[in-house]
Amino acid sequence: MKTFSAKPHEVNREWFVIDAAGKVLGRLAAEIAHRLRGKHKPIYTPHVDTGDFIVVINVDKMRVTGNKAESKMYYRHSGYPGGIYETSFAKMHARFPGRPLEKAVKGMLPKGPLGYAMLKKLKIYAGAAHPHAAQQPRQLEVRA
């Protein structure tokens, strides 16, 4: 019996909606990364994007445990000497509610063209409304 290998044109992608209200950042990101990669499917193939589309709503109500809201820092660099910037989770979440989740999921996906294609299937919205009703997404319950 030969090992099955999924072909890109044979993959059937579904749309799911996840409500992030009250969910913990890291646990939610791990489940989303798992679904974006397609590891929940029996046809999973490492070199083929077999994942589903994920729409995350209410990310403005997402939380972190402990005192990470103040102590968790995000760093970026301008490229100039001394040009390092740091932002706490609380500040970033207040200004850009979806960015902490996006950065967490991005860190859990493969680096390279395949990982970037997987990340494009993630849609993040701060409120409860989203423009993907035409895709008829199913509700996905995540224990996070």
From Swiss-Prot:
**Could you provide one GO biological process annotation from this protein's UniProt record?**
translation
Question: A GO molecular-function term, please?
Answer: mRNA binding
A single GO CC term, please? cytosolic large ribosomal subunit
The answer to whether the entry has keyword DNA damage is: no
State whether keyword Mitochondrion applies.
Answer: no
Q: Which UniProt keywords apply?
A: Ribonucleoprotein, Ribosomal protein
Top-level division of the source organism's lineage: Bacteria
Q: Which CDD domains match?
A: Ribosomal_L13
InterPro entries, sorted? Ribosomal_uL13, Ribosomal_uL13_bac-type, Ribosomal_uL13_sf
Gene3D superfamilies registered for this protein in UniProt: Ribosomal protein L13 (3.90.1180.10)
Q: Which family does it belong to?
A: Belongs to the universal ribosomal protein uL13 family.
State the protein's purpose.
Answer: This protein is one of the early assembly proteins of the 50S ribosomal subunit, although it is not seen to bind rRNA by itself. It is important during the early stages of 50S assembly.
Subunit composition and interactions: Part of the 50S ribosomal subunit.
Entries under HAMAP family matching the protein: Ribosomal_uL13 (MF_01366)
Entry protein name: Large ribosomal subunit protein uL13
Q: Which organism is it from?
A: Nitrosospira multiformis (strain ATCC 25196 / NCIMB 11849 / C 71)
Report which gene this protein is encoded by. rplM
